[in-house]
């Protein structure tokens, strides 16, 4: 796998296709998260185009140039309001290609590497509170629970990793 890099505008269609494929896969394997929250309407292609223009959308590619995953790294997140203030990047919209073993772990590690030279102290993310498998995976990656959030129908666990 190549390192994480800023997404180019010409990759936006392929990036959004990853999210659509992930939602279909969740339906097929009965995982209830993005597919139950109208995710593709909540985060339409224009949102990703905006994140790309702002330098917040990143991609992970394979050695052959194939798109393996994408992530948005935000400098702030209102779900964390009222929490201890630390210099943080907020991981959002992390997606991997179906079958791209190790891509999610690689995205997190590469994002963490990028964060340090920018003076970040922590990486933060949230995960649906009823997705026990994904919460366990995030914990295995060093992202520990430190609170909860509610955003409309979404109930999440706030997770943080010290860098």
Segments (PLM) and residue ranges:
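A short beta-loop-alpha structural element at the N-terminal edge
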Residues: 2-18, 24-26
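Conserved GNAT-fold acetyl-CoA-binding loop/helix
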Residues: 20-47
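A short helix-loop-beta-strand connector motif used in the catalytic cores of GNAT acetyltransferases and
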Residues: 43-59
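Conserved beta-strand in the GNAT
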Residues: 59, 66-75, 90, 95
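A short, internal acetyl-CoA/4′-phosphopantetheine-binding micro-motif in the GNAT/acyltransferase core
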Residues: 91-102, 128
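Conserved acetyl-CoA-binding loop-helix of GNAT-fold acetyltransferases
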Residues: 101-113, 136-140
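Conserved GNAT acetyl-CoA-binding A-motif
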Residues: 115-127
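Conserved beta-strand-loop-alpha-helix junction that forms the acyl-donor binding cleft
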Residues: 125-135, 151-154
């Amino acid at each position: 796998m190549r390192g994480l890099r800023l997404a180019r505008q010409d990759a936006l269609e392929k990036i959004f296709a990853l999210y659509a494929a992930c939602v279909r896969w969740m339906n097929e394997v009965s995982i209830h998260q993005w597919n139950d929250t109208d995710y593709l309407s909540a985060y339409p292609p224009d949102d990703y185009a905006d994140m790309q223009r702002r330098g917040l959308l990143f991609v992970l590619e394979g050695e052959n140039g194939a798109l393996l995953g994408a992530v948005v790294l935000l400098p702030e997140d209102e779900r964390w309001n009222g929490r201890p203030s630390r210099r943080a990047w907020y991981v959002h919209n992390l997606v991997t290609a179906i079958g791209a073993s190790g891509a999610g772990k690689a995205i997190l590690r590469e994002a963490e590497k990028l964060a340090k030279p920018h003076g970040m102290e922590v990486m933060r993310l949230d995960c649906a509170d009823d997705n026990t498998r994904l919460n366990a995976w995030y914990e295995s990656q060093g992202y520990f629970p430190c609170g909860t959030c509610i955003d409309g129908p979404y109930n999440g666990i706030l997770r943080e990793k010290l860098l």
